[in-house]
Amino acid sequence: MGSKITDKKRKSRDSESESDDELANGLFDGILSQSEDEEDYLPSDDDDDVEDSENEGTGASEDDDDDDDDDDILSDDIPSDVDSEEAINRLVKQQEELEITEPGVDPKREEDDGADRNYRIEKDANGGERYVYDEIDPVYDSDDSDAKGPVNTIGDIPLSFYDSYPHIGYDINGKKIMRPATGDALQSLLDSIEVPKGWTGLTDVDTGNPLNLTQDELELVRRVQMGLLPTDLQDPYPDTVEYFTSIEEKMPLSSAPEPKRRFLPSKNEAKQIMKLVRAIREGRILPYKPPEEREREEEEQEEVHFDLWQNEEPQAPNPMHIPAPKLAPPGYDLSYNPPEEYLPSKEEREEWENADPEDREKEYLPQKHNALRKVPAWGNLVKERFERCMDLYLAPRIRKNRLNIDPNSLLPKLPSPSELKPFPTVAQTIFRGHEGRVRSVSVDPTGVALATGGDDGTVRVWELLTGRQVWSVKLNSEEPVNAVRWRPTKDAFVLAAAAGEDIFLMVPTHASVTPALDQASRDILATGFGYATNGQQPAAPVSKEPAAKWARPGTKLEDEGVLIRITVRSTVKVINWHRRGDHFATVSPTGQRSSVAIHTLSKHLTQIPFRKLSGLAQTAAFHPLRPLFFVATQRTIRCYDLQKLELVKVVQPGAKWISSFDIHPGGDNLIVGSYDKRLLWHDLDLSNRPYKTMRFHGQAIRQVRYHRGGLPLFADASDDGSLQIFHGKVPNDQLENPTIVPVKMLKGHKVVSKLGVLDIDWHPREPWCVSAGADGTARLWM
């Protein structure tokens, strides 16, 4: 029997090991329900006894089989026949109970749960089992779906009283509410980085736990921030119900009798009529008279004439008469009852009396009297009057003529604006089509097409004179187009646009673009790819990140005319071309060291010329004649020589924040616009300081631009929604100063979100300018 039991236990152990392997492999994951109690699966005392006996039996059998050659075995280690028979009886009894009960049902569990069951089993009409559930007791604890946790019931007592205790208060049952555990500094840092849903950063003063918002509370906050109603159950715009017009009422709304005031004379009107009657009787109100009778009465009245100058006496003119100067008004010390601080002390009185009359500061001493009637006569009155007459007689007096100068005469004489024509005066064409702000405009070198870029991520090309849109492409659906600039030469029709961190080079299709011009433009853009494949581009170190990536934008954009995409490290805000069209500069104000980049079109090469800038770069431009490069930071403009690679000049406009600048086509003058509402003219040969500062706007100046076609015009664009046109003539003689005359202020753009006119550009030949506004329009001024 011992060996049989041992074999059975070994088989059971093998089966248990196999089941353990299957659970480890995840074959039975999730079979047990979470609602089952863990106590039902704990081993009972009987099972422990069986297992102990089995273990003892198994150990004995193994010792008998394996240790045949060992020493004698103690009698206590050998199992007795009685113990083995009792163990066998228990196993047989348990096996019978398992066979009787249904599989998966624990009889002990049913007996234990019988007292807690909320139902009873009855027989139905067919003899089957029917479950009858108890009535639900509608007490407060029965519905605990919205029940809150333990509430701190300490009342209006500060939690600082419990700082020295491990608990923070008591719940409604009088049990202690323990203080919540707090993490270390690392855990606090991780909690601040990984913010859970509904996190507010606040702590509940009652419990000390973090105070989080539920999903309903977050939805309520979101709706309040968006200006919506707190719930969706209310209709903010219900349909109007016409109660008195839509339904024909057959019965009167009110059957009250007619009020008495409808058929009785008004007492108030009777009082007003009596006032008029009394005024007529007293003659204060005259009856109406015809105009003829009124004129006849006026003619009958005699007119009284008298001489104003009847008693006037002639006086001899005395132009040399000068009135005497007035005496100084008396002070507080001349009062009959002066303040105490004006009265002299005993020492001061003795000092004044002992001094000579010529050495005294005053000819009198202040005295105090209780009443004005007690003031005696002034003994020095005759002496003072005599000395005053002597001063008027002997002291020379002259008449001084004041200079009455007209302030306008001090201003320089400027020519009349009518003599300085032509310049733009009216809005000729309005270009509408962008959604949101129009951030940049540019007129092509031929003066036929206009390119615009806006917040909707599109670039649009228009006919300048007609305002008709001829071409458009969407570059980015998330980022706005911050800058658009045409290539300055006429041998190609190439447009550069910046959207986010990408710069796109494209060839728009237009009626004025011939097939030869279109092919020449595409060849110029495709030259760089061949250059890169020939290996002529200098090899960059492998460890360094390239300054920019030149690639094709994709089939969709290539079909629309976009041929090259240049990806840089940060958002591009400014694009400016070199006069020859092979180089262009981009500025990314947030790019730090790589904020300014120079791109070579023929080589597909991008260079970062500066290792470090003393400030945030705002804009950059090439000199129109010489190999100079200008970079503007927030307060200064630096001029670099590209051949010698050195700093040439630092221009200091004195502005708080420079927004834009432009170089005169002659190359010797510079205009600067700033966010502090100032327009500054610099003469580069004269000084680093501004030659003239002009303040004509009430808001920030966004853009300034010279006319490139030889006309002495320049303009600025401001956030107040206006453009100021100036006549700026630069003489050929170095001894003469430039002539700057404001000639016209153009208004038409609307101010949206405190933004007005964002960009401006001139026609290459005509005195026309184009502006871009935050109201979503571009305007042609002629």
UniProtKB/Swiss-Prot annotation:
- Which Gene3D superfamilies does the entry mention? YVTN repeat-like/Quinoprotein amine dehydrogenase (2.130.10.10)
The stretches annotated as WD repeats are 433-472, 476-516, 567-609, 612-650, 653-692, 696-736, 752-782
The residue range of the signal peptide is none
Q: Does the keyword Nucleus apply?
A: yes
InterPro entries given in the database record: BOP1/Erb1, BOP1_N_dom, WD40/YVTN_repeat-like_dom_sf, WD40_repeat_CS, WD40_repeat_dom_sf, WD40_rpt
Role description:
Component of the NOP7 complex, which is required for maturation of the 25S and 5.8S ribosomal RNAs and formation of the 60S ribosome.
Which family is this sequence assigned to?
A: Belongs to the WD repeat BOP1/ERB1 family.
Q: What is this protein called?
A: Ribosome biogenesis protein ERB1
Protein source organism: Chaetomium globosum (strain ATCC 6205 / CBS 148.51 / DSM 1962 / NBRC 6347 / NRRL 1970)
According to the entry, what is the taxonomic lineage of the organism? Eukaryota, Fungi, Dikarya, Ascomycota, Pezizomycotina
